[in-house]
């Protein structure tokens, strides 16, 4: 494999990290006390030309953990009227996370990456809820880096001058249906599309692969 082809791999592009796009819907802003109600993850793959694309999607509605706080305003915002309704088909936090991590580990290994890194819109929020759920479930083998992320709010602010997901997507030339927004599944798919678009645009503009000094090869 040539130096250039080596650079056009997921492993090389993100310094050994395997990016996974995540979105959560919750019953408030406090990751320690408020319920995690929905989670979706989209893995990414890189084609032979070095362009990034969404790969696999995994999505769960989640049962509120025992004693979880449910803020009325948050439920109205995300449209989850009754978190305890059997019609949601919800699973426990542990079931959801274990299945998500199983998929991530499999695809991370196939990409020869050393660790997963979360990609999310306002990533600190999503990571805080995932980390809190990991602690509640006493999960030891967590694929995500505990604090490093790729935040598409920041990246889209740089690339498109917009930090709101809907506005960033529209500025990027993507379709965005506000009626579908605040569903973890829809928001994750759109965030994945946005992140891939930013990475691919940077490559198309000549930002990647880096031009290495001959003495460093």
Curated annotation (Swiss-Prot):
The record marks 29, 77, 125, 147 as: Important for substrate binding and specificity. This is Ribonuclease T. Trims short 3' overhangs of a variety of RNA species, leaving a one or two nucleotide 3' overhang. Responsible for the end-turnover of tRNA: specifically removes the terminal AMP residue from uncharged tRNA (tRNA-C-C-A). Also appears to be involved in tRNA biosynthesis. The gene is rnt. GO terms for cellular component: cytosol. Its cofactor is Mg(2+). Its EC number is 3.1.13.-. Belongs to the RNase T family. The lineage of its organism: Bacteria, Pseudomonadati, Pseudomonadota, Gammaproteobacteria, Vibrionales. InterPro entries: Exonuclease_RNaseT/DNA_pol3, RNase_T, RNaseH-like_sf, RNaseH_sf. It comes from Vibrio vulnificus (strain YJ016). Binds two Mg(2+) per subunit. The active form of the enzyme binds two Mg(2+) ions in its active site. The first Mg(2+) forms only one salt bridge with the protein. HAMAP family: RNase_T (MF_00157). The active site is at 182 (proton donor/acceptor). Residues 20-195 form the Exonuclease domain.
